[in-house]
């Protein structure tokens, strides 16, 4: 069945050489830069960075600069300096700036750039990252794209700056699929939607006629698996984002819930409700449609999430009374409980880095978003309140997105928080929003 509502194509429109470093622009610093951010030492002071308006024939250069600055500021690692403090006016972004003018305003890094329209209609975006106190250029790159894709250029540049200054991959050139919620609480319409990670470019990918929940990206970013109540009983579907084609993932007699892809994209793990009221975890191989049962308890086993290498699965089970977190082999072997704190645990999701598991915890009348090591040690709650739920990892494993509902009237909203728990930001959406899932970096 085709959902002919919105073209959600996410294949890059950049030319093959778009993200290559132009030889004429590169001037790399020595192996150890003077300016850098150590993101492994916990709470840090944001790095003051000056981002000048990219030279262009219209407003586009300023628009791109604004997106870059917003990306970096939202990470909590950078403090973009107000443009009113700038002393030097950049007229040639390729030339070395007057470093003393930037040191005076404590700009430890400087970004300059240019946007030009090519004869074929494409845009050429060039940028340079300067170490002002070291007096050297750190990187210079150029990209080509279509005019309607300018926001992606901004996100890619922000990722390049983030990576050069932190040593970690960025996460700005990504998308988030989520459940859009509109209408009164008693008749809430829930549609699947997709957007850029900063809340821009929202597009709907389901029509809202049937309740749709728990969307999850495939590793190739081209597919989403989700649960739909079409026909009255929840079933798991697979949606092709580029074409709108969708298919049922197994025509099981009972309800199927909580789907998620394996890291190689070849399997979907999900829970099937049994006649006795229990729920067990199954996988379906998408290549040959064979199913494998992984758990066989009388409990409710759900919320399965693979480790990045595909060798293990974390899931929620109430086999011990309250819902707790368990880890087992990807074949269902050796299940063991890892959560040992008070309260109930749910919605576990393994970090892309493999070092942590994020979760929702309900305890003492509050819902919290937390992380723990994969053996259950080192539990930390990042944020707590009336209702926080459904964490999803940025692809670099440094930031989480989740949804929050405040007490009283209203509905859920999306937020991000870093691993320090100090940098929490709301993501603006057109309506109420829940169940976010972060994509891998786009290509």
Curated annotation (Swiss-Prot):
One Pfam match: PD40
Segment forming the signal sequence: 1-33
GO biological process terms, semicolon-separated: cell division; protein import
InterPro entries xrefs: 6-blade_b-propeller_TolB-like, PD40, Tol-Pal_TolB, TolB_N
GO cellular component terms listed in the entry, alphabetical order: periplasmic space
UniProt keyword terms in alphabetical order: Cell cycle, Cell division, Periplasm, Signal
Compartments (UniProt record): Periplasm
Function: Part of the Tol-Pal system, which plays a role in outer membrane invagination during cell division and is important for maintaining outer membrane integrity.
Family: Belongs to the TolB family.
Subunit note: The Tol-Pal system is composed of five core proteins: the inner membrane proteins TolA, TolQ and TolR, the periplasmic protein TolB and the outer membrane protein Pal. They form a network linking the inner and outer membranes and the peptidoglycan layer.
Stated name of the protein: Tol-Pal system protein TolB
Source organism per UniProt: Brucella canis (strain ATCC 23365 / NCTC 10854 / RM-666)
Gene expressing this chain: tolB
């Amino acid at each position: 069945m085709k959902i002919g509502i919105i073209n959600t194509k996410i294949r890059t429109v950049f030319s093959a050489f778009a993200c290559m470093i132009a030889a004429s622009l590169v001037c790399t610093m020595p192996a150890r830069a003077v300016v850098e951010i150590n993101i492994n030492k916990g709470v840090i002071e944001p790095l003051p960075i000056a981002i000048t308006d990219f030279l262009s024939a219209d407003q586009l250069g300023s628009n791109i600069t604004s997106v870059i600055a917003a990306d970096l500021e939202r990470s909590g690692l950078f403090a973009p300096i107000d443009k009113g403090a700038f002393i030097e006016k950049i007229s040639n972004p390729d030339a070395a700036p007057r470093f003393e003018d930037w040191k005076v305003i404590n700009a430890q890094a400087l970004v300059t750039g240019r946007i030009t329209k090519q004869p074929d209609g494409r845009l050429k975006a060039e940028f340079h990252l300067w170490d002002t106190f070291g007096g050297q250029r750190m990187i210079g790159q150029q990209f080509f794209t279509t005019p309607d894709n300018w926001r992606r250029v901004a996100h890619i540049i922000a990722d390049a700056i983030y990576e050069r200054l932190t040593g970690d991959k960025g996460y700005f050139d990504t998308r988030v699929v989520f459940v859009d919620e509109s209408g009164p609480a008693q008749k809430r319409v829930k549609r699947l939607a997709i957007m850029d990670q900063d809340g821009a470019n929202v597009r709907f990918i389901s029509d809202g006629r049937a309740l749709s929940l728990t969307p999850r990206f495939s590793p190739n970013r081209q597919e989403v698996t989700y649960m739909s109540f079409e026909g009255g009983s929840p079933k798991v579907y697979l949606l092709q984002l580029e074409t709108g084609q969708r298919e049922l993932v197994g025509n099981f007699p009972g309800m199927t819930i909580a789907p998620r892809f394996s890291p190689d994209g070849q399997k979907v793990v999900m829970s099937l409700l049994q006649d006795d009221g229990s729920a067990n975890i199954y996988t379906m191989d998408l290549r040959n449609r064979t199913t494998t049962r992984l758990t066989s308890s009388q409990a409710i086993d759900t919320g399965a999430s693979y480790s990045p290498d595909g060798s293990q699965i974390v899931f929620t089970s109430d086999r011990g009374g309250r819902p707790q977190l368990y880890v087992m082999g990807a074949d269902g072997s050796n299940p063991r409980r890892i959560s040992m704190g008070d309260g109930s645990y749910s919605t576990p999701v393994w970090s892309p880095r493999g070092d942590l598991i994020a979760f929702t915890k309900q305890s003492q009348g509050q819902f919290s978003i937390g992380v723990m090591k994969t053996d259950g040690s080192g539990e930390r709650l990042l944020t707590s309140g009336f209702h926080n739920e459904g964490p999803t990892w940025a692809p670099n494993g440094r930031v989480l997105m989740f949804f929050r509902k405040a007490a009283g009237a209203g509905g859920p909203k999306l937020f991000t928080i870093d691993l320090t728990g100090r940098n929490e930001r709301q993501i603006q959406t057109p309506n109420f929003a829940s169940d976010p899932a972060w994509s891998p970096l786009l290509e």
